[in-house]
Design a protein with these regions (language model features):
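N-terminal subdomain of nucleotide-sugar transferases
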Residues: 1-44
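Active-site and donor-binding regions of nucleotide-sugar-utilizing enzymes
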Residues: 8-13, 20-25, 71-137
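Conserved nucleotide-sugar phosphate-binding/catalytic loop shared by glycosyltransferases and other
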Residues: 36-80, 90
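Anion (oxyanion) recognition and catalysis
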Residues: 30-31, 58, 120-121
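Flexible, glycine-rich phosphate/dinucleotide-binding loops
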Residues: 18, 46-48, 135
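Membrane-targeting and insertion segments and their boundary/processing signals
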Residues: 27, 61-65, 119
Length: 137
């Protein structure tokens, strides 16, 4: 990294719930003199069935670096496995083409698992918020 160049943090968001928690982090990254935001939108955000919540991110004015659609399979155990496999491949391709200095994920949904797996295999440092939290319902 050249002197004065910002470190790039890829923030992965797949749902409205975790985006609400990541929004302040994204805002701080945008304002940072040392770090830059590389916002990657995936999962339910890009699904008509789940409300196309990417529009909320756009309304907030946050720049979206990439949109990675992954919900192409049925909501079955096999379909989820297929989604995870495809998502790992898509995240790996994106991270390889436009490598961040760090990948930031929140939670443990399968799209987050896929992004974390790709980052780990590619030896990109991973920051993980709220992994292992227990949710009910």
């Amino acid at each position: 990294m050249a002197a004065g160049e910002k470190k790039r943090v890829a923030v992965i968001t797949g749902t409205r719930a975790e985006y609400g928690l990541l929004r302040p982090v994204c805002t701080k990254l945008l304002a940072s003199d040392e770090l830059s935001l590389q916002l990657v939108v995936t999962g339910a955000h890009l699904s008509a069935r789940h409300g196309n919540t990417v529009s909320e991110i756009e309304a907030d004015g946050l720049p979206i670096a990439a949109r990675i659609p992954i919900l192409n399979y049925p909501s079955t155990p096999l379909g989820t496995c297929q989604t995870i496999g495809e998502a790992v491949a898509l995240f790996a391709a994106y991270f390889s083409a436009d490598p961040p200095d760090c990948v930031l994920v929140l939670g443990d949904r399968y799209e987050i698992f896929a992004a974390a797996t790709a980052a780990t295999v590619l030896r990109i440092p991973l920051a993980h918020i709220s992994g292992g939290d227990v949710t009910l319902g």
